[in-house]
């Protein structure tokens, strides 16, 4: 990091100016505008050269020291900024604001913008499919206030959360690229370990000043209308976010219009492990392929894709909203109405982010062209929505209004294919502004004037070799060969002498030069002024335009879910008051799409008579797929979507937990088993009788007895909690749980062997598995044949010595547990087993002594 420089007297004037600005941004890279380049100095230069793979050089000396320097062309800055932002860096943009021609000493410069990962809005720096969120948190271990802002859409929300576990789960859900925390928090807290964590001064979180700034931003007297007046911690966090956004953008933020109070009670909570295991929008390798989002997303707009991702990551418990979405999807499916709407939506584009850039006053000409095209497409879109009877769709259609005046304004203002930036002009149409037209005409018609002037002067002077030209140094000129220069008329004023030629200027040419050269700069200045005025005009309509964008995004998601329902054979789930989870012919929506063979659908029934299924069967038999598909079906139902099942009936759940697969947490110093136990502990502490719990192979990472004991106790606890539980295990001993826990049942995934090869049937059947097929799976995996043969010998010996003599008795109506060897259990010695069955009271002393001698010979 750079160190602040307090004594600037020994530095050059340029470096004095640099350090006055740099001292205010020591922990951020500074791009310092020098002509056509952004130059980067000192420690910033060393860091940037390494990160951007550009040459590190030096720029003279200051204060007796060489100045490390690297630079990038200002017109190519976007690519470099994108790379730095992806690496988590923040960049201060320092521009020249003075005129080099009139400046005495260094040209005036000032910081015009600070680009941070959470406050970027440039299209080139953003992932169009993901929200770009920044969050701030305030509180202690008991209660936290969390504020979340998406500056690229204007979405601003607050909530209060109890405890670290819930806070970390929420941070995992929103996945902010920056997280602001108070500087007076102790070092090393869990939140600080997240990427993008930045400390801010404690007074940035002060409640009263935060309340005041929020009320000013939203033009309200208080925050009661947003339902968060009494959320002291959340208001403090929101105030910090607003301050940070203003600090980085250096402009007003008119697109931030309201604050939404979110409540965890309204949502189905998934912890970090569950989100990871279910691969909602990121797979276990960190990519997007073969995720739920990749299968469910055929949205026509980027803002629709982002909204769908938000829904998948925040399933709801509000029946009114869920049923309104179901009704909307059903309406779209009738007569395939979604097919009429989707092509129209595709014309809309990502106006949500375009409107945010307009609010930030950094919208580019192509943004306005896309907004023009979107507004022009709205009337036809409205026509496509006229026959939608669902009340929610009618409400969305009404909100997605038309804007004929704005569409006409942009049609008149912006050329069909504008340049990327306003910098060099050429954006506004001819006829939009008369003064601009005159200035551009004067500038653009200079060539014809020079042609006409040359012809007139040749005729007037009789000098056939006379030429009229222009260069950037000397401006316009009349050129004569040296031999003819003496014949120049008296009104020719010598301007430049060349080898073999003389150049002149005339009063007429000088007058034209003054007009033409200034016309271009004046035209560019006026075009920029008109462009800024156009942005201000659009800012005045931001509120309804943002409402329209939100309505169109939701229409996109709902029509997309209708298309998915049709093409993926999804059906509408039914929510009921009775506690239950009944799925007929359920399928895994992702696995089904990647299989080359038909997916085997399976049923599930959990209710007040059965709350837990103990699932046994071979590896690769489909246990994990069956469990995950249940969670995904339940989750899709709770976003209002149709689900991959022939039918589905369920009550609302409050949480979805998964304990499926673990790996070492090396950075945190935790083993695989420790990670597994931490996840299990979280489930046992927080699951309720409304939770869905998936437990896969609990207890694998320790000794057999320890693992079995922990798995058994955890299963008993969940059964007694009455959580909806799918408990997959290879501990065959757990199949006796139904004998002691009446809400537990056994099911298994079946398989068969043919010619010493295993065939997985993937069908879920009642009762426990009859055998594990472990050796067959090992053979399928390519374990050497001699190892398999030796394993069979060991297995035969273990089965001979370890089979229990008596199986537990089945309860009436429950299938008997089949006999299966337990290759890990340490069962009693046969002598001890026989001795335990002897009825000593029925024996004579002589019989007892004879038995003792007999048993002794068997030891």
UniProtKB/Swiss-Prot annotation:
Region of interest (Disordered), residue spans: 799-821
Gene Ontology terms describing biological process: mismatch repair
Keywords: ATP-binding, DNA damage, DNA repair, DNA-binding, Nucleotide-binding
GO CC annotation terms, alphabetical: cytosol
Highest taxon in the source lineage: Bacteria
Disulfide bonds: none
GO molecular function, one term: ATP binding
Chain's role: This protein is involved in the repair of mismatches in DNA. It is possible that it carries out the mismatch recognition step. This protein has a weak ATPase activity.
Family label: Belongs to the DNA mismatch repair MutS family.
UniProt protein name: DNA mismatch repair protein MutS
Primary gene name: mutS
